[in-house]
């Protein structure tokens, strides 16, 4: 079980801190929830304590975050030419909550955006992938948003 003050990652949302643990009554059943305040976006989400193993995880350690940042240039990205298949594949990768998969989605969308204008759905996905990736790396590397953003775009090339 996590505690108040723990830094966690919520797949599809990004990194945040557990502000409180509260009990809510839903359908006459009391359930405990983590109230997570996300670092980017000024958003709070509630995660059922009973589902913590699938809905939140701890922030990656500093060494792993550095490895990902250093390997970003060499990460292989696949570009399906069919928009709907590409979108679905990228969404599935983001849903895993895996930092490397999120980095791959971000990189592939950045590179695709350089080639041609992204659709509205892919622009939104690019923004989400960036928020998720940046929030976790900021915490793991203890760095500022602007510095990390510069480093990420330099690593992509």
Placement of each model-derived feature along the sequence:
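A positional/architectural concept
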Residues: 1-55
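Charge/polar-rich, low-complexity and marginally structured segments
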Residues: 50-157
